[in-house]
Amino acid sequence: MGIFNGLPVPSDKTYLREELARIDESWAAARFDSLPHVVHILTSKDREADIHILKEQSDVVEEVVDEVVHAYHGGFNKAIQNYSQILRLFSESTEKIGDLKHDLAEAKQSLGARNKQLHQLWYRSVTLRHIISLLDQIEGIAKVPSRIEKLIADKQFYAAIQVYLQSSLMLEREGLQTVGALQDVRSELTKLRGALFFKILDDLHAHLYNRGEYSSVASSIYERDDEVPTTTAVAASRMSSQPLSRRTRTLKGDSQFGVRGLTNGSYRTASNDESSSFDGHDEEDSVEHDESTADTARNGTDSKLLSHQLPPWLSDSTPDEFIEAVRKSDDPLHVKYLQTLVQCLCMLGKVAAAGAIICQKLRPTIHEIIISKIKAHLETTNLSKSACSQGDRSVAAGLHLIKGQSEAYRLSKEKPQNGISNSGTHLAVSPVSPLMAPGGKAQAAAKELLDSILDTIVKIFENHVVIGELLEMKASQHDINTPRSLPTDVNWNTESEASQATGGYTISFPLTVLQSECQQLICEILRATPEAASADAAAQTAKLAKKAPKKDKRDAPEDGLTFTFRFTDATVSISNQGADLIRQGWGKRAPNASLEGYGSAAVLPEQGIYLAASIYRPVLQFTDKITSMLPKKHSQLVNDGLLTFTENFVKDHLLPTMFVDYRKGVQQAISSAAAFRPRAHTTTYTATVEKGRPILQGLLAIDLLAKEVLGWAQAMPKFATDLVKYVQTFLERTFERCRTSYMEAVLEKLSYMLIGRHDIEKLMRLDAASACLPSTLGHAVSHSEAVGTEVELSDLFLSLRPIKQDNLIRDDNKLILLASLSDSLEYVADSIERLGQAVPRVASQAEGNSRNQAASPRNLASFADEYRKLATDCLKVLRVEMQLETVFHLQEMTNREYLEDEDAEEPDDFVISLTSQITRREEGMAPFISGEKRNYVFGGISGIAANASIKALADMRSINLFGVQQICRNTIAVEQAMAAIPYIDGETVQQNLDRVRTYFELLNMPFEALLAFIAEHDQMFTPTEYSNLLKVNVPGRDTPSDAQSRLLEILSH
């Protein structure tokens, strides 16, 4: 049976377990029923056997019970003893309770008899406890001033204000108001309130301008040793600490203290592409940056707090709702500190006074910061100059100039091998010095300086936005100028504007002052007088004056921002409380705000209006950053700010000045006597200007000026359209001047008239030699077509005989000018084409589009085509001129007799004249055009010389053997002159002149031998040329009367 499994059966009686297992479990049931067993025995056939079985089972159970009793005998005895002892203890407790009841009854009777005396003693003890509590409070209050001073010294301002407010409340309690000894404490607390206010205000002022211990920058702006005046350092600083996010507006679930911006996720930084628009901005590379990683302490150590860690300046404060909100906030460290300082001012009821003093100190502080930045920049520059004996000549200007422009400005500083100084050309025609040119040191220095200053201003304005939003929110919640739980005599008008509650301090005021100071600095850099630059501000003021006033000024967003200069600064409305504090001396520590000038001239190599190009991009980036920081309701504040002033200044002052200056430079460049005077000090052509490519000085100057103007366009993309139009105007004027020089050289000359003929122009375009021309159309021409074209051109030129000398360009200087003009025009065309591909594309061209829709302005590519076409015309004139010169000299072969008496030792005089002219002109043109172009100019001589010599036979009356030798000697002289020209196709020249010698040597053959040669080489010469061989009179040769008919018969087969 399973119920007996746990019984203590000895190991020598294991059979008991087996016997127990045979017993039915029904015998061990809790509600045992014996009736079924009795009925079973009574009805059994063998009752004795069943009874015997039951007895055996009963014996087994008895034996098991004996074993159990034997095993648990000691335990049973101990349980009986314990039970007996428990009964005894209960009995004793009953007796003692009875005695206690008796004693209590007696005590009750005794106390009832002394009730009055007990009441008196209780009242006395309560009074004494209250007196002791008051004494403790008085003792504690007496220590409050020293405690507050200690907290102030430790910069635990929030804890100090908590102690101050708590102590003030205690002093107003009924029991302490009449204590005379506390009057001194009250007086000390009143003084400490003022001292605490000024300490908080000093610290707030320091952190507003990033001079405090918890500022957002790694070091103070006055720690000059850490400043690196490079564009890279400025960019890195901007990336590490620049906020680009719009602030959240209110705290979810407004708390009693009105904590602003303490929810998780506030003050987050947006990506850079929300705040960059240079080049189509940039500047151009956006990186997501977490502002919380940039908060570093002034000593350079990492001051970023761990999440939900209590800031150190609140370590001694009593926990409350504000502290809990700060602890849970994910805002940067400096933002939390600014929130704490504003909360302290609200608890003191000094917001209006603080706002008034901050407004009073804002302009002189910004002025001082800008001056200190300039001085630090100057000192760092001087240190870097002294450290390097020779500074790097390349300046990281930040002006990413268009492709190819760096080459032009490098040329302006180098002297090429031809002895012509491009720097001198640049200085002679450019209205600006190399320092002031795009990419110059002055431009780079101005951009670097302004980048550094505006970056500092942006960081300062970030703090002002934080403070301004906090004050605006708190002003909308409760009276921020009444100390919390502290009676005051100040009675503020609930209908007053929010700016009056903050002492005139709003987000618009620091933005106005900051941009005004920056504008004044820019005017100093540009040397712009206030009269020249304040017209825009006056127009803005008039525009705002026309606007209808808002009925509800508290809720309406500010519609615009107007500022001019320091002397037209906005008026600050200072409350009485703030004015009193200023008179008390806090404002006296500020430097004189009326100081003019920043000392930027000591840093910049040069100042002037052209620095507006390097200023434009930093101002554009500054405006983007400011816009991204402003809350939505203040987004209109930047519409009439610094960027508008800069753009208006560029549009109204810089662009007109630039156009007049560069137009004058262009005029000087193309009108000077040396502008179109070919000059070269090398005998061979070089392909680069640095190595001596002799570009005409006028065109080289125009190219430099065009690149310079487009450099300004790259620096100011918004005005690229106007600047490109300037370049087009200059190029058009220069092209007209080039065409005038070209016409002066070719006017009324036969070569100029011939290239203008449609048939000749078409044939020249199909000529294989034209493949090297800049404006070739690239038509594929077969060899047979090329030969046919050359022959046809030659026939046309020969048909012009006799050619007069007046129809030719006899002045070699004019031909050299055409060669130099062609190369220079091609150089400028290539440069214009590169510039046209890199000109910045302006997204919108608001001005002039409506007028130019019908006829869109020409682009730079069309000017490049015009320049290249004129360069091609120059080369065509030179080629045709040399061919006409050849025809002019060789036309003396006609109508004469070549009956010489002796062997020819020298060529004819006209051939000597031709070859010397070829040599002289080739040497004159060699420095000005490439070898390929020289091959084009002189390559047509051999072909037309060969054709002219062969055709001259038809007009000869007679010729003998020595005459043939004279003509062969002439061809050898021409061949030698042509072979002396580098890059000339000598094989073609030899083939052409060999053909002449072969042709004339046929005259030495007998008639029958000549017919046999013609029969074998009928395609070598034309039938007319073969016929001329028979027509000419050759002394000693027998020619039958039917010679022509026999020739025709041979050629007809």
Swiss-Prot record:
Residues 91-121 form a coiled coil. InterPro entries: Sec8/EXOC4, Sec8_exocyst_N. Residues 255-308 are annotated as: Disordered. Residues 263-278, 294-306 have a biased composition (Polar residues). The keyword Transmembrane does not apply. Pfam families: Sec8_N. The keyword Magnesium does not apply. One of its GO terms (cellular component) is exocyst. It is found in: Cytoplasm, Cytosol; Cytoplasm, Cytoskeleton, Phragmoplast; Secreted, Cell wall; Secreted, Extracellular exosome. Keywords: Cell wall, Coiled coil, Cytoplasm, Cytoskeleton, Exocytosis, Secreted, Transport. GO terms for biological process: acceptance of pollen; mucilage biosynthetic process involved in seed coat development; vesicle docking involved in exocytosis; vesicle tethering involved in exocytosis. Disruption phenotype: Male gametophytic lethal due to defect in pollen germination and pollen tube growth. Component of the exocyst complex involved in the docking of exocytic vesicles with fusion sites on the plasma membrane during regulated or polarized secretion. Involved in polarized cell growth and organ morphogenesis. During cytokinesis, involved in secretory processes during cell plate initiation, cell plate maturation and formation of new primary cell wall. Participates in polarized pectin delivery required for the polarized development of the mucilage-producing volcano cells of the seed coat. Belongs to the SEC8 family. The exocyst complex is composed of SEC3, SEC5, SEC6, SEC8, SEC10, EXO70A1 and EXO84B. This is Exocyst complex component SEC8. It comes from Arabidopsis thaliana.
